[in-house]
Structure formats: structure tokens, C-alpha cells
A protein has these predicted regions:
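Conserved SAM/SAH cofactor-binding pocket of Class I
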Residues: 100-203
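Conserved Class I SAM-dependent methyltransferase catalytic core
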Residues: 221-285
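Non-catalytic accessory regions of SAM-dependent methyltransferases
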Residues: 1-44, 48-51
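Conserved hydrophobic residues forming the short capping helix/wall of the S-adenosyl-L-methionine
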Residues: 16, 110, 159, 234, ...
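Helix-to-beta-strand junctions that scaffold the AdoMet/dcAdoMet cofactor pocket
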Residues: 164, 212, 238-240
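Conserved AdoMet
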Residues: 32-109
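Flexible, glycine-/basic-rich loop-and-beta segments that form/coincide
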Residues: 286-303
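Mobile active-site "lid"/loop adjacent to the S-adenosyl-L-methionine
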Residues: 195-226
Length: 303
């Protein structure tokens, strides 16, 4: 027997709330929107109308998946980042509010450069950081690099979603290998790499370790493998005077900052997030002093 959208909403909200889900009201709405194909505005407009049996069945199926621990973002297939919608899937991490600071700081640094600019989003995942920068800065071109085919498919879809096909591209690449000369150089390199120590993965929340990709989480024994590799190998991809910005995990900021110091970066900064946690570490490639081109050295050694 069918029920109204309002009755179905109340039923789902009560089930989620009883399971201890804090944002039960928001998530019940998201589930109904996903099941019905309606926007939030359309759902409010039609809230007193009757649903179809198919919509009710789909909504209750999504509810059960949520009760089993699956993140709401994966259930609905998209999530908001810096006020922009992005397609998501279990192939990439869900965009998080903490990471919005990385995008904002990247835009701040790009404003220091004259004319058209280029941003490289390494370990791009959904592409949310690089594409947010490109969407909000009309003179910026973005290159999104990831090793995961599933993540690259999300990048492709999100480029199209935000009508950025003329200013953004996605490429398959390994952050722990030297960059290709074909990439050219960038004004800003942003990266939210895997940074969870391997030994801590088992202790992650079930909604994370059970659904989000391990390759996007595992940062090696101390969580710093990607910071070491990228800091040394990807220097040639930055223009002199260009900025490298990392998101970091709790307690990692000083160690990552020291990696940048040892690599010759200047103007090292650590920025805290809204929770008071050191979240972004950045450094600037010197404008005059040449940093050793480790890519050339690597190629010469191989030759």
C-alpha cells in the first residue's frame, strides 16, 4: 500500500534516528530525493502527494543500506563540496568539509600569480579540489591525476557536470613516480594523499573502512609515504615561485613541513581547520634558486 511522501519521510527519519544517526532528518530527505529523482525543492512541493510503490521500495532499500553502515553520499551518488555538487562512488573518498580549506588556500595562492594559471590536483579522487578551483577561477586550467580508473571516471563525469571540458583534463598517473615532462609546470600543486598509517586502518570507523577505498587511505607505516615521494619527485612540475599544498592528518603537520624545508621550499605555512587541527601544510618553490631537477637525475641514472 502506498503512502504519502511525508509519511514515508517520517518513517525513514525515525528508523535512522533510532539507529543513532545524528543527521537523520537530512539523510531521510536525501534518501527520498534519490529514490524519487526529485530535488529537495520538488520534494517539499510534493510532500503531501502519494508515492508510487516503486519509489517506496527503493527508498526503503536505501534506508536498509544506510542502516548497514553505507555512507549516505554513496547511497545518493553525489555530495557537496564548497557549495558545488560532485558525483561520488566507492571508487574515491567522499569530499569532506575539512578539505574545503585546501581548495580555498589554493585559490588564494593562485591569486598571487598574474594572468592565466594552472593547478595540478594530484591524488585527485573525485577531482573536487581541482575542479572547484577551476569552476570558481575562470582564468585557471586544471589537470587531475589519479592512479585509480574508477576515480578517473568520476573526474571525467565531474568535469562534464561543471562544464569544464575546455579547462580541465584528467590523466592516469602514479604520485610515487616522477611526472611526465608532457605535464608541463603548474602555479599550484594541491594534494590530499593517502595519509592514514597502515596500522591505524583497522581502527577506522566502519563506514570508512567498510566502504571507502583503501588505496586512498593507506599512507604507509607512518602515513607519510606519499608526502616523501611527492615532495621529492614532483618538484619539476612546479614553476619557480609555485606553491605546493598538502592536506595532512592529525599530528603530521610538523613532519610534513620539515620535508618541505629539507627539499628547499620557502614560506612554509601550516593552517588549522575550523576544529583547530593543523590541516594544510604548504611551501613555495624558490623564485630564483634552482631546486635540483630530480626527474632529470632519475632518468640519467636509469640511462
Amino acid at each position: 500500500m502506498t503512502s504519502t511522501y511525508h509519511d514515508l519521510y517520517l518513517k525513514i527519519r525515525m528508523s535512522l534516528s533510532s539507529a543513532g544517526i545524528e543527521a537523520a532528518q537530512l539523510e531521510a530527505r536525501e534518501i527520498l530525493c534519490a529514490a524519487s529523482g526529485k530535488t529537495a525543492e520538488e520534494l517539499y512541493r510534493d510532500i503531501s502527494l502519494y508515492t508510487t510503490e516503486a519509489i517506496a521500495e527503493q527508498a526503503l532499500a536505501l534506508q536498509e543500506r544506510r542502516l548497514a553502515g553505507e555512507p549516505i553520499a554513496y547511497l545518493v551518488g553525489e555530495w557537496s563540496f564548497c557549495g558545488l555538487p560532485f558525483y561520488v562512488s566507492p571508487a574515491a573518498l567522499i569530499p569532506r568539509v575539512d578539505t574545503e580549506m585546501l581548495a580555498q588556500l589554493a585559490m588564494n595562492r593562485l591569486k598571487e600569480h598574474q594572468g592565466s594559471t594552472r593547478v595540478l590536483d594530484l591524488c585527485a579522487g573525485t577531482g573536487c579540489v581541482g575542479l572547484t578551483v577551476a569552476a570558481l577561477m575562470k582564468n585557471t586550467r586544471a589537470v587531475l591525476v589519479d592512479l585509480s580508473d574508477g576515480a578517473l571516471d568520476l573526474c571525467k563525469r565531474n568535469i562534464r557536470r561543471h562544464k569544464l571540458t575546455g579547462r580541465a583534463v584528467y590523466l592516469k598517473g602514479d604520485a610515487l613516480q616522477p611526472p611526465s615532462h608532457a605535464l608541463g609546470q603548474f602555479d599550484v600543486l594541491v594534494c590530499n594523499p593517502p595519509y592514514i598509517p597502515t596500522g591505524d586502518l583497522a581502527g577506522l570507523d566502519a563506514s570508512v573502512k567498510g566502504f571507502e577505498p583503501m588505496m586512498a587511505l593507506d599512507g604507509g607505516a607512518d602515513g607519510l609515504d606519499f608526502y616523501r615521494g611527492i615532495t621529492s619527485l614532483w618538484q619539476p612540475a612546479l614553476k619557480p615561485g609555485g606553491h605546493l599544498l598538502y592536506e595532512v592528518g592529525i599530528g603530521q603537520a610538523e613532519q610534513v613541513a620539515w620535508l618541505l624545508v629539507k627539499a628547499g621550499y620557502e614560506n612554509i605555512r601550516i593552517t588549522r581547520d575550523t576544529g583547530g587541527i593543523d590541516r594544510v601544510v604548504e611551501g613555495q618553490r624558490p623564485k630564483e634558486q634552482e631546486i635540483p631537477d630530480l626527474l632529470h637525475e632519475t632518468l640519467e641514472e636509469e640511462g
